[in-house]
Amino acid sequence: MYKLKTRKAAAKRYKAVGNKKISRRKAFRSHLLQKKSTNRKRQLSQVVIASPGDTKKIYLMLPYL
C-alpha cells in the first residue's frame, strides 16, 4: 500500500478542531481594506467552522488529518 498524498494548499488553509470539525479563516481580508468598514474587517478576521458539506471534501484532501 502506497502513502496517500496530502494536498499542501489545503493543509495550509485548514486545521482540525475536536469532534471531526475543520476550522478555516474567512476570505476578503488581505487587501483593498480601506473601503471596508471596521466592523466588517473585524468579522472577516474571525476563525469559523467549515460547513459539513465542505468538511467531507477537506478530509479527502487531507488524509492524515
Curated annotation (Swiss-Prot):
GO biological process, one term: translation
GO molecular function terms noted in the UniProt entry: structural constituent of ribosome
Record GO cellular component, one term: large ribosomal subunit
Localization: Plastid, Cyanelle
Keywords, ordered alphabetically: Cyanelle, Plastid, Ribonucleoprotein, Ribosomal protein
InterPro entries: Ribosomal_bL35, Ribosomal_bL35-like, Ribosomal_bL35_CS, Ribosomal_bL35_sf
Pfam families cross-referenced by the UniProt entry: Ribosomal_L35p (PF01632)
Cross-referenced HAMAP family: Ribosomal_bL35
NCBIfam families, per the entry: rpmI_bact (TIGR00001)
UniProt record similarity statement: Belongs to the bacterial ribosomal protein bL35 family.
Name of the featured protein: Large ribosomal subunit protein bL35c
